[in-house]
């Protein structure tokens, strides 16, 4: 996803790490506690869509908090399916994605409402079709179900939506669970590999503008001020949510020769 093809797929120990500047374009983002919010901003949505898909490709957004990914997918001539739990959120997404669009564009948009446990039943008609699937793994969306070995809930369901060559993007980041720091990245990598996916890249999506080679913390999204004010664990310093971590996986055209073996170096440590 960055650099030459030989750089991306050469059998080296450390995967490429890229930084994307994704500061929101003036919109006010939702507030939440403990640094949970890791929004897909407009610039981030466009970067993901143009990097991972082509015109008329299918984008699937699972449990979005807002319209950013869906609306940008339509604007970039992609088809898009999304499932949300809250009917009010579904209404906002539909309105923002279709207002001012012609009938052909509106037919590209599929917004469904379903209970959390029925999410992938609502998306069953998209299995094997998606060029890009985006899911979130934040402290508010941390799965309640674990596998036999106690690891994070499998990513098999979102992986099943992918067409061969399609990409799964997991939006996550270090956060607090019950007052303790939690890094979900190693468990997510293992879960994706069990689902038959190949780990491509780690993207750091920076939410604040950069000035003089530094993130301007005073201009971070609205949830930063709230997260700074929260009582936090003594194990980590008080911090602003300056970025999210994006883990990008792909569904190979044939099963990986060494599924379950992580080529990601330090991220498995």
Mark where each language-model region is.
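Class I S-adenosyl-L-methionine-dependent methyltransferase catalytic core
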Residues: 1-269
């Amino acid at each position: 996803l960055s650099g030459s093809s030989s750089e991306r797929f050469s059998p080296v120990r450390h995967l490429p790490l890229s930084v994307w500047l994704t500061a929101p374009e003036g919109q006010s983002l939702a507030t939440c506690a403990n640094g949970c919010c890791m929004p897909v901003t407009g610039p981030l949505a466009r970067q993901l869509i143009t990097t991972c898909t082509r015109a008329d490709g299918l984008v699937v957004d699972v449990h979005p908090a807002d319209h950013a990914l869906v609306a940008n997918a339509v604007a970039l001539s992609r088809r898009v399916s999304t499932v949300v739990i809250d009917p009010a959120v579904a209404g906002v997404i539909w309105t923002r994605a279709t207002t001012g669009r012609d009938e052909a564009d509106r037919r590209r948009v599929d917004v469904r409402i379903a209970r959390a446990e029925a999410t992938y039943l609502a998306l069953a008609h998209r299995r094997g079709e998606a060029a890009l699937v985006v899911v979130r793994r934040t402290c508010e969306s941390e799965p309640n179900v674990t596998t036999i070995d106690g690891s994070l809930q499998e990513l098999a369901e979102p992986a099943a939506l992918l067409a061969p060559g399609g990409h799964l993007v997991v939006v996550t980041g270090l956060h607090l669970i019950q007052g303790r720091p939690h890094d979900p990245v190693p468990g997510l990598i293992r879960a994706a590999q069990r689902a038959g996916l190949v780990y491509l890249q780690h993207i750091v999506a920076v939410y604040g503008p950069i000035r003089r080679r530094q993130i301007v913390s005073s201009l971070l999204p609205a949830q930063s001020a709230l997260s700074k004010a929260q009582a936090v664990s003594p194990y980590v310093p008080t911090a602003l949510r300056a970025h999210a971590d994006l883990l990008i996986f792909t569904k190979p055209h044939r099963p990986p020769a060494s599924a379950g073996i992580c080529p990601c170096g330090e991220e498995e440590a």
